[in-house]
Amino acid sequence: MSLDIKKPNITKTKKKKTGFVVKMQLNNNRGGNKRNIFIFFFFRNYYTWILWFCLSLYFFTSYFSVEDQSSPSSIRLLSNHKTSSSLPSRALIESSAIKTTSIGLFTGMKIYVYDLPASYNDDWVTASDRCASHLFAAEVAIHRALLSSDVRTLDPDEADYFFVPVYVSCNFSTSNGFPSLSHARSLLSSAVDFLSDHYPFWNRSQGSDHVFVASHDFGACFHAMEDMAIEEGIPKFMKRSIILQTFGVKYKHPCQEVEHVVIPPYIPPESVQKAIEKAPVNGRRDIWAFFRGKMEVNPKNISGRFYSKGVRTAILKKFGGRRRFYLNRHRFAGYRSEIVRSVFCLCPLGWAPWSPRLVESAVLGCVPVVIADGIQLPFSETVQWPEISLTVAEKDVRNLRKVLEHVAATNLSAIQRNLHEPVFKRALLYNVPMKEGDATWHILESLWRKLDDRSYRRSRVLSQREVDM
């Protein structure tokens, strides 16, 4: 026995009820308040779109309210340019890749630039245009940028630092075209004697608040060969000063046993711009792994040392005939046009750990592959190099192809995206006049950070001045 129970048609009942309500509203408002009817139907039909609009507006305004609370300098560095990078990429850059300090904070720091006789600086540029454009020309660029900088003071009594503009890397007297440093120590010693005779500031602090540039192989040791650099060491009269040098390692080394800042080598900004303008229109990089430079098939034993510790020779022998490796031992003036076509740019050590390839590859969008154990990269406290480069141990150079293939299959696109951020290019290039966030600006930031640590020296100087008065 079964009961045949018919369920009421709920849907139809609801529809009729709804229709009845609407009819009542229509009848009650006929010839009267038609606006209420419009509002009712508008919200009934478009409430989903209205809800999405309100939520979007909320998240949009919340994003910018958070942005306003971020580092002002980081925002300015990123807001002055248009970028096609995604929001996650931008967040990565702002949070970790570049840590910056607002330029306004530099207003409390003053630098006095000595007006030395031209024989210490300008005469070298007059003798050779290369003095202001070759890879060691940071000494010229920094000097020129400081002359027009807001931190410069014409009153030495209010200075926190004293900049000594001596160009030691412009003596192009060698047969290979590289500058000789044989005169560097005597030229610097002569400059210090001049300061001691004509100004009271060097003697007052023993040079501890004076800044020099050493933009060549082994920095403050002023020698191109490491064994000789170590043997001669840092000139005694400079051991209390601050050295801006391209040489830097993470381990103890006689040539950096002085207060110093590791800076990038000089690359002319105009040459970078020209290379970018001549890059393939489609942005295609048809060279997978690139290196052009000195590579010895049979490296010579020079005082027990081999050029590049044999790393470049190992690269040549292992990958010289490989299709995906573009290796060339000969010089080519237009080699930057090859960098903009390359995915990976090999940066092995030479006699010294650093090379201009580090900067050239990074600013031209080619991933720098650093092969130099223990190297200290420029501005490592502010520029997060792991975000824009690879590091391969010297002992692993024979596995280089596998390393690059792994990166290409995993995080290559993220590294390339970071490299395209203008903040990186700006941090590694020198401009005259200085631009916020460029290489000279980061040098000033490093000096500014040192002020607290050096405040006792400043107070000591002021106390001594009062005694003298």
UniProtKB/Swiss-Prot annotation:
Primary localisation category: Golgi
Disruption phenotype: No visible phenotype.
Lipid bilayer topology: Single-pass type II membrane protein
Expression (tissue specificity): Expressed in xylem cells in stems and in roots.
Carbohydrate-modified residues: N171, N203, N301, N411
Cytoplasmic compartment residues: 1-36
Keywords linked to the UniProt accession: Cell wall biogenesis/degradation, Glycoprotein, Glycosyltransferase, Golgi apparatus, Membrane, Signal-anchor, Transferase, Transmembrane, Transmembrane helix
Transmembrane segments annotated in the record for this chain: 37-57
EC number: 2.4.1.-
Keyword check for Ligase: no
Cellular localization per UniProt: Golgi apparatus membrane
GO annotations of cellular component type: Golgi apparatus; Golgi membrane
Record-level GO BP terms: cell wall organization; protein glycosylation
One term of GO molecular function: glycosyltransferase activity
InterPro entries, sorted: Exostosin, Exostosin_GT47
Lumenal side: 58-469
Family: Belongs to the glycosyltransferase 47 family.
Protein's job: Involved in the synthesis of the hemicellulose glucuronoxylan, a major component of secondary cell walls. Probably involved in the synthesis of the glycosyl sequence at the glucuronoxylan reducing end.
PANTHER family, A to Z: EXOSTOSIN HEPARAN SULFATE GLYCOSYLTRANSFERASE -RELATED, GLUCURONOXYLAN GLUCURONOSYLTRANSFERASE F8H-RELATED
Name of the molecule in the record: Probable glucuronoxylan glucuronosyltransferase F8H
Species whose genome carries this gene: Arabidopsis thaliana
